Design a protein with these regions (language model features):
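Beta1/beta-strand and adjacent pyrophosphate-binding region of the FAD-binding site
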Residues: 2-17
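Glycine-rich FAD pyrophosphate-binding loop
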Residues: 10, 14, 26-47
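Predominantly flavin-linked oxidoreductase catalytic cores and closely associated redox partners
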Residues: 14, 40, 116-242, 250, ...
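C-terminal helical "tail/cap" subdomain of flavin- and related membrane-associated enzymes
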Residues: 293-366
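Short beta-strand to alpha-helix junction loop
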Residues: 95-116, 218-225
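N-terminal FAD cofactor-binding segment of flavoenzymes
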Residues: 24, 38-85
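Conserved mid-domain beta->alpha element of the FAD-binding
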Residues: 254-320
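Glycine-rich phosphate/pyrophosphate-binding beta-alpha loops
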Residues: 46-49, 103, 200, 270-282
């Protein structure tokens, strides 16, 4: 579209958010380049790998259109499917819920998103690190400079544009996890209480193994380290550890604004993680599609880039608002001792707990 710049749009980061931006922009004719320091994209693994099925997403995010077009997960990217989620209280009691989920092979999943974006016409530059962006120019660490009319930061909560141009702070929960061989059943587990202060621990079963880990709020940890909590929790499971990973989840919800001038944030850099359950992959892709489509409309019809924020709020505003509220209430609850949490998590409150996890209003007055 543009002859003044090297590209119409440059996307920093080729994960689910960035590749989805590229896919939807490129299929409408936008000349887009994705730059990612990893090769292959998606490696090393940095998350729990669980996503809702398409039908579950339609229930969780009813204002998001064309879910089946957005989420095209091939069989080879799915380790196993599950139909139950167990919320585990400190006493070990399980509140059981129906939940249709997909346990991913995350690296394969992300590589598939790259393939779809490339087939749509997107360009990729891997193994290259972005140093900074100024105006319409992206500066790489190797000294290369590239220009674009629109520059998107999909590089995570510490992405170069987010870090340089956004002052708004957000709570980031450190996480540590492992992949373990063994047989762990077919129900997703979320554990709450002192096992993971201010956060939660998880066991997500996969074919022949599981993804096991936790995240904490350091202010709740009483001087103990993430490693202390992670090692204690993981040691409860029997199996051979084949991979250890760590990362961070932004848990304050979306920023007040994720467009400044010709800069856009998407995915973790924009806070597109649901605080009440840590869901980020599918949420980032929802934001990525909106951003990609708005970039095309901006270049073609001079639609303001801020339309991205407007459409996001229309599709995800209610869900994010409910999730942020549930996280705040949960943060207060999780300061309580385990015996009180055991009393609060019971058959009478089972529905309220599930509404919090699935980003519905917990109470009709809140």
């Amino acid at each position: 579209m543009s002859t003044e710049f090297d590209y119409d749009a440059i996307v920093i980061g080729g994960g689910p958010a960035g590749s989805t931006v590229a896919r939807y922009a490129a299929q409408k004719g936008v000349n887009v380049l994705v730059i990612d320091g990893r090769d292959p994209i998606g490696s090393p693994l940095q998350c729990g790998e669980l996503v809702p099925s398409n039908e579950e997403m339609k229930r969780l995010c009813p204002d998001v259109p064309d879910v089946d077009d957005l989420f095209q997960t091939p069989d080879e990217a799915i380790s196993m499917t599950c139909d139950q989620m167990h919320i585990i209280t400190p006493s070990g009691k399980a509140l059981k819920y129906r939940f249709e989920g997909l346990m991913l092979n995350r690296v394969v999943h992300d590589e598939n998103l790259v393939t779809i974006a490339k087939k749509s016409g997107a360009n990729y530059m891997v193994g290259k690190r972005v140093l900074r962006a100024e105006g319409n120019t992206v500066f790489l660490r190797d000294g290369t400079t590239l220009t674009a009319k629109v520059i998107v930061d999909a590089g995570g909560h510490n992405g170069p544009i987010r870090r340089e141009y956004w002052d708004e702070k957000s709570t980031t929960i450190p996480v540590k996890f492992c992949l373990m061989d063994g047989n762990f059943g077919d129900a997703v587990e979320l554990h709450f209480g002192s096992v993971a202060p201010g956060g939660y621990a998880w066991m997500f079963p996969k074919t022949g193994g599981a993804n096991i880990g936790l995240g904490i709020q350091r202010s709740f940890a009483k001087g103990k380290t993430l490693n202390h909590y992670a090692d204690n929790f993981i040691s409860k499971y029997n199996g051979e550890t084949t991979f250890n990973g760590a990362g961070g989840l932004p848990m304050s919800g979306t920023l007040k604004s994720f467009v400044k001038g010709n800069f856009m944030l998407v995915g973790d850099s924009a806070g597109m993680v649901l605080p009440s359950n840590g869901a980020g992959i599918t949420i980032a892709m929802i934001g990525g599609r909106i951003a990609g489509e708005v970039i095309h409309e901006h270049l073609e019809n001079n639609v303001p880039l801020s339309t991205y924020e407007t459409v996001w709020k229309k599709q995800m505003g209610k869900v994010m608002k409910n999730s942020k509220r549930s996280f705040k209430i949960g943060s207060l609850m999780f300061r309580l001792p385990n015996w009180m949490l055991n009393l609060l998590f019971n058959r009478l409150t089972k529905g309220i707990v599930w509404r919090a996890v699935t980003c519905k209003r917990m109470f009709f007055i809140l």
